[in-house]
């Protein structure tokens, strides 16, 4: 049986009681239909005692990230994030034993990264790469 890419991911629908369901669904829809990612999965991160945040993982089918597992943390534009928050996100990912994606340009070679999927007030979603550590800037001729 072939999966209909126009239907929402069942794992997203299971998160209807999560306060971040709206942004999760918007980012998942953009990744699935707009960016054409496949194998989308929802993970739930325990950021602190009272905060459970959804995290999406998937594989882009074209572009520079083709066939490489990626993670996206859905956020609203008006949310305030801090270095401590981002650190707790990476720590939560490690606790779930998720296969983390490394950035080879990192100073130690062990820097992990994910993308923030930020939804603006007009429903536009922008993606920012966040790294757990320091990396050297990318040159124009590098991928």
UniProtKB/Swiss-Prot annotation:
Keywords: tRNA processing
One Pfam short name: Sen15
Alphabetized Gene3D superfamilies for the sequence: 3.40.1350.10
SUPFAM superfamilies: tRNA-intron endonuclease catalytic domain-like (SSF53032)
GO biological process: tRNA-type intron splice site recognition and cleavage
GO cellular component, one term: cytosol
InterPro entries, A to Z: Sen15_fungi, tRNA-endonuc_su_Sen15, tRNA_endonuc-like_dom_sf, tRNA_intron_Endo_cat-like_sf
GO molecular function: nucleic acid binding
Family to which the UniProt record says this protein belongs: Belongs to the SEN15 family.
Biological role stated in the UniProt entry: Non-catalytic subunit of the tRNA-splicing endonuclease complex, a complex responsible for identification and cleavage of the splice sites in pre-tRNA. It cleaves pre-tRNA at the 5' and 3' splice sites to release the intron. The products are an intron and two tRNA half-molecules bearing 2',3' cyclic phosphate and 5'-OH termini. There are no conserved sequences at the splice sites, but the intron is invariably located at the same site in the gene, placing the splice sites an invariant distance from the constant structural features of the tRNA body.
Assembly with partners or alone: tRNA splicing endonuclease is a heterotetramer composed of sen2, sen15, sen34 and sen54. Interacts directly with sen34.
Protein name in UniProt: Probable tRNA-splicing endonuclease subunit sen15
Organism: Schizosaccharomyces pombe (strain 972 / ATCC 24843)
Gene: sen15
